[in-house]
Curated annotation (Swiss-Prot):
This protein's record includes keyword Zinc: yes
Keywords, in A-Z order: Cytoplasm, Endonuclease, Hydrolase, Metal-binding, Nuclease, Ribosome biogenesis, rRNA processing, Zinc
Enzyme class per UniProt: hydrolase
Annotated organism of origin: Erwinia tasmaniensis (strain DSM 17950 / CFBP 7177 / CIP 109463 / NCPPB 4357 / Et1/99)
Gene name, Swiss-Prot/TrEMBL: ybeY
EC numbers: 3.1.-.-
SUPFAM superfamilies with a match to the protein in the record: Metalloproteases ('zincins'), catalytic domain
Protein's recorded name: Endoribonuclease YbeY
Superkingdom of the organism of origin: Bacteria
Family: Belongs to the endoribonuclease YbeY family.
Molecular-function annotations in GO: metalloendopeptidase activity; RNA endonuclease activity; zinc ion binding
GO biological process: rRNA processing
Length: 155
């Protein structure tokens, strides 16, 4: 058993059709143990209003977004397995899946993997960083049996 602890918070008005908690756990366990074997992550599933508010407050972007990552930084000298929080907007993820021709499950998995890598310190601001992060995401997605999430961008 992995040392990955998931705290799943459902803050969506409509919870029907969401991935199961076991799916979120499986996606986290595909990423985290190789980097931080003992880790705790909160995943909060939200509606557009909460996503928009958080995106505006923390990124100065007045629109909802697919996933926001909030890494936890323990005070010096204190070691905790708490990695951070992922805030995922249901409507944005599901709309993107349709627009990008992906299954909802694959896109949900990708958003959890993408957000988890952000919690671990990966970023995609610079081209070389983006290439490294996207390569890791693709490797993890393929290992889980999902298609390359960037295939349409590579064609």
């Amino acid at each position: 058993m992995s040392g990955v602890i998931l705290d799943l918070q459902l803050a969506c008005e409509n919870e029907q059709g969401l991935p199961a908690e076991t799916d979120f756990q499986r996606w986290l366990e595909a990423v985290l143990p190789q980097f931080q074997p003992e880790s705790e992550v909160t995943i909060r599933l939200v509606d557009e209003a909460e996503s928009r508010e958080l995106n505006h407050t923390y990124r100065s972007k007045d629109k909802p977004t697919n996933v926001l990552s909030f890494p936890f930084e323990a005070p010096p000298g204190i070691e905790l397995p708490l990695l951070g929080d992922l805030i995922i907007c249901r409507q944005v993820v599901e709309q993107e899946a349709v627009e990008q021709g992906k299954t909802r499950e694959a896109h949900w998995a990708h958003m959890v993997i993408h957000g988890s890598l952000h919690l671990l310190g990966y970023d995609h601001i610079e081209d070389d960083e983006a290439e490294e992060m996207e390569s890791l995401e693709t490797e993890i997605m393929l290992a889980l049996g999902y298609p390359d999430p960037y295939i349409s961008e590579k064609e």
